[in-house]
Amino acid sequence: MLDHFDLTIPAASSLAIVGQNGAGKTTLAKLLCRLYDPQSGGIEIDGVDLRELDLESWRARVTAVFQDFIRFELTLRDNVAPAGAPDDTVRAALESAGAANLANLDTVLARGYEGGTDLSGGQWQRIALARALCAVRLGAGLVLLDEPTAQLDVRGEAEIFERMLAETRRCTTILISHRFSTVRHADRICVLEHGRVIELGTHHELMAQGGRYRTMFDLQAKRFTAEEEEGATYDVLN
């Protein structure tokens, strides 16, 4: 739930959003997708209330990857470009997502079909990211990434998001992640707490402030070191 939420996102910039579970991160992403509309207040796109824009036209400008992304029992090509795209565009998106060699474009991504195959959770996540990158190549200008790489390790996620930010540098990109090694690369970072923005700035600015972001970043860095040494798994935001 968002409460007295006020945030301006410059076009063609990247914004990372962090905060504890229930802070309002996913709510914001779903509002921007117009999966539902705000009960009070509003969202403006270039000064126009989002609710006044044609829904179909708006969604054609947005691509989103959520943690519970869709897995189509279709060919690899149709998973990356459900609405269709040139093969060169599909292949370029797969390469940028680190999934260039997963399967032939005509391979069905499901067991039970002739020549079909299934993928691991991490491989499916790369397919979902390739779908977003393909949409960008086809004209989408707003990219929403809500914990889309939870099944990748820390280094794998950092590598993917460096590629994503490079590929979407002309887009407005919003990244939601628990991993600070990833969010630090965004142009700005927003810290949400109880539905409100409590800190906003670059990684270096927020570290210098010594506030909530600095506390969470330092704690996760220590726990990541412990995880490397002991094989344990920690989540600093829970």
What feature does the model see in each segment?
Residues 1-10, 41, 105:
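Conserved beta-strand
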Residues 154-156:
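Helix N-cap at the start of a conserved alpha-helix in ABC-type nucleotide-binding domains
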Residues 69-113, 133-140, 212-215:
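Conserved "ABC signature" C-loop
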